[in-house]
Structure formats: C-alpha cells, structure tokens
C-alpha cells in the first residue's frame, strides 16, 4: 500500500482558504489508509493556531490519525540524518547558512518520508528540491 504525508503548507491552505480541499479530498478518498500525519506538521500547525477555534481546527486534522496510530515522529536516527544532510548543504552552499534553521523541520519531514517509503505532498518546491539534491525521497509538488 502506498504511504503519503502532507506538508504543513497544504493544511494551512485548507484551513485558511480551502484551496487545497479538492487535492486533499481526492487523496483521502483514493488512499485514506495510506495517509499518515507528521508530528512535525502538528507542531507547526499548533504553533500558528492563535485562537481556540484555530486550535480546534488543527486538532481536528490530526486526531483521527492519533486514534488509528498513524502519526509519524522523527526518531534519534532521523535527527542524526537531518544533521548530516544540513551539514552537506552548508558545505555545498555556505551562502545558505542563515537559512539552515528554517530547513530543520523540512529536513526532518523529508527524512521521515524517506524512511517509511512514503510520498510527501507540498507546495514548497525550493526547500524540498534543495534537500533532494543531498538525499532522495518521493516528492509531489502541488501547483
């Protein structure tokens, strides 16, 4: 069975404007048992939820995955792999040093995606393409 992870940006679009509703609905309808939710995405969404209503909307997204045990959380090995990838990027592109802290969560998400043999869906072409130059993983960049 194919496995899928959805990046934070697509869920933000879903919550704020509904622009990704058709994409997410199609994926859920086609392959619901193969969809997983990353604890990284949960953290990023909760960090952006400034109201009680926003928090409830975010929790409504990941609670079903908690109930069925399909939450993906980076392991110690994933953190080490992410560190090695970020070091390699810095070695190849010293001009990106100030960008590295912003890449940590994306790198952890990429490493998690790769380790479980999943496909990651995102709109963030630039950051994930940069990570793919160092470590391959399955990626679908949406519109």
Give names to the regions the model predicted:
Residues 1-37, 47-63:
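Short, well-structured N-terminal submotif of metal-dependent ribonuclease cores
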Residues 1-3, 110-143:
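Acidic, PIN/NYN-like endoribonuclease modules and their adjacent C-terminal/linker elements
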Residues 6-7, 38, 101-103, 124-125, ...:
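Histidine- and aromatic-rich ligand-binding microenvironments
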Residues 10-11, 41, 78, 108-109, ...:
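Alpha-helix capping/helix-boundary segments
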Residues 38, 42, 55-58, 79-82, ...:
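A general structural signal for well-ordered alpha-helical segments in protein cores
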Residues 52-56, 89-90, 138-141:
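Short, hinge-like loop/turn segments at secondary-structure boundaries
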Residues 70-119, 123:
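Active-site neighborhoods of divalent-metal-dependent phosphate/nucleic-acid chemistry enzymes
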């Amino acid at each position: 069975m194919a496995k899928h992870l959805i990046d934070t940006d697509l869920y933000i679009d879903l919550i704020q404007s509904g622009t990704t509703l058709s994409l997410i609905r199609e994926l859920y309808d086609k392959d619901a048992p193969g969809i997983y939710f990353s604890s990284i995405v949960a953290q990023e969404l909760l960090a952006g939820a400034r109201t009680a209503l926003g928090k409830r909307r975010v929790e409504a997204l990941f609670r079903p995955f908690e109930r069925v045990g399909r939450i993906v959380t980076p392991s110690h090995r994933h953190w080490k792999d992410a560190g090695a990838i970020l070091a390699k990027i810095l070695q190849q592109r010293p001009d990106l040093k100030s960008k590295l802290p912003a890449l940590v969560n994306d790198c952890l998400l990429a490493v998690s995606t790769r380790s479980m043999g999943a496909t990651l869906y995102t709109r963030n072409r630039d950051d994930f393409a940069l990570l793919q130059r160092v470590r391959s993983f399955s990626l679908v960049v949406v519109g």
